[in-house]
Swiss-Prot record:
Domain AMMECR1: 5-196
Protein species of origin: Methanosarcina acetivorans (strain ATCC 35395 / DSM 2834 / JCM 12185 / C2A)
Classification via PANTHER family: AMME SYNDROME CANDIDATE GENE 1 PROTEIN, AMMECR1 HOMOLOG
Family matches, as Pfam families: AMMECR1
UniProt xrefs under SUPFAM superfamilies: AMMECR1-like
Transmembrane segments: none
Gene3D superfamilies: Hypothetical protein ph0010, domain 1, Hypothetical protein ph0010, domain 2
NCBIfam families in the record: AmmeMemoSam_A, PRK00801.1, TIGR00296 family protein
Protein name as it appears in the record: Protein MA_3591
InterPro entries, A to Z: AMMECR1 (IPR023473), AMMECR1_dom_sf (IPR036071), AMMECR1_domain (IPR002733), AMMECR1_N (IPR027485), AmmeMemoSam_A (IPR027623), Uncharacterised_MJ0810 (IPR023472)
Amino acid sequence: MLTETEGRVAVKLARKTIETLLLGGRVPGPRDAGTDLPPVFGENRGVFVTLTEKGMLRGCIGHPYPDSTLEQAIIDSAISAAVRDPRFPPVGGEELESLIVEVTILTQPEKINAPPKELPDKVEIGKHGLIVKQGYCQGLLLPQVAPENEMDSIDFLGHTCMKAGLSPDAWAKGAEVYCFEGQIFKEKEPEGEVIEEKF
């Protein structure tokens, strides 16, 4: 778990990365934050960066698994959310002052070992994010997606399957389901105070 101070640093690092990319015209690297980072940023963590503009999703990409340091994962995810999310055109520099930056720090995903009919009871809305895998297909939804969209556990499982390109009931037909938890830090308003969001 990150402290509130570390969470603020995470969001500021994500925003600084996007600003450097869009206004400086170059791909940022480690230490572009211009400050010494707390030790936790040297630990390997999964992370997602989410960008919203006027309440609408503008980009969301991340590292589901702890395959790089938190610092590098935030930098990579911030760049990807801003200019590589295939669902949206790249963010422009003029949008920076209207974007809200959110960083979700993930725990290691763990497979839910339960018969399909018991899976909905194993999913805790507001606590768990989900990954569904079947063959070459994989989909992920962050923990905040279910409460923000008023989903129950069956809806959440179905939407995660669809994110993977599978039928909504694939979870009941042998797809592997993994859960993880997320710690969410976000700006209350563009470039504003950073808070920890809990559901």
